[in-house]
Amino acid sequence: MKNRMISWLVATLFAVPFSAFADKGAFDMDRWYNMLDSVRTRAASENISDTMIKSTLRSPVFIPSIVKSDKNQSEFKLTLNDYLARTVNQNRIAQGKKMRQKYPTMLTRVEKKYGIPPHVVLAFWGMESNYGDVKARHKLTDAFLTLMYDGRRETFFGNQLIALMKIADKNSLDINKIYGSWAGAMGHFQFIPTTLAQYGVDGNNDGRVDIINNVGDAMHSAGNYLNKLGWDKGQRIVRRVVLPADFDLGLLDGKTKKSLPEWSAMGITNPDGSQLPQTDMIAGLVADVAHIERVRDEAKTIAAPDADIAPMPVISAYLTYPNFYRIKRWNNSNWYAIAIATLADELH
């Protein structure tokens, strides 16, 4: 133990950025080295090769900016319209169409094997990495070790590191060349290691699963993941609708489920005013409630003095079908799921 700590001290003392020591006592070296030792012990117990363990722990770096990013994730929430303007812009739509032309055979194979249509695969690819254009900034081993040391989600990030080591070991990858986001997502579809370990697929049959450098592996892995989530290729994701001006906003939680005839009976229509399909399809309902409340308040303040009741603005919302909730198991965000649906429609 002592010799191991000495060797790590030599390797990492100058690797840890000086800012980590800016506040006396802010960085606990003993805790850092004990954590590295626990990683080594666990990795060995889970049959990860000694070569991989040594490679992973050779020159670990604590990165304060990652902790800062994790602690200071923005609480600012874009309106749905602003979010869609950013994520489903004309450039992303155009690039998606180019990618469909570039990879027609691969997309067809993914659809045939996993039942995921090309426009859906492309929508996830576009949202996650702008079709592989997002640059990975952080070496994932350092990111996971840093977040483990931070302590708030040590078990989660420890599991991610071990999964990454197993993936690199199995696929003969240089773990020190695997880069991703500060939170540990990687590749064309931004999988975390535990997701990759469970759903990763060797799409080109070269004996390795590489979702960072191989588009085929990435697409097959995404298709496999969505398939396992239960994707229904014959079902739409959302339906944009208009609600009555005085509609109860408490029903816009995505959790209240009703049949389309039941929603229709409450005054919900298609955007052109036509009736919803009278099928027994069950759907939830979501909208930008905060935005609607602001608009309603503004409408009240500018109402005519002689008006007994302020006119209420038209409410746009989305009926949400089962595929919507499958998307939320990929990324638990209503806005993200609506953006996927919108981009997929543009690429259909």
Tell me the role of every PLM-derived stretch.
Residues 1-9:
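Bacterial N-terminal signal peptides that target proteins for export
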Residues 82-221, 227:
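Acidic/His-rich structured neighborhood in mature extracellular/periplasmic domains
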Residues 175-290:
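Flexible, glycine-rich surface segments
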Residues 9-10, 20:
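Cleavable N-terminal signal peptides
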Residues 23-111:
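An acidic, Gly/Ser/Thr/Pro-rich helix-cap/linker signature
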Residues 15-19:
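N-terminal signal peptide c-region/cleavage motif recognized by signal peptidases
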Residues 60-62, 128-132, 185, 232, ...:
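Solvent-exposed loop/turn segments at secondary-structure junctions
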Residues 244-348:
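C-terminal soluble interaction/assembly domains
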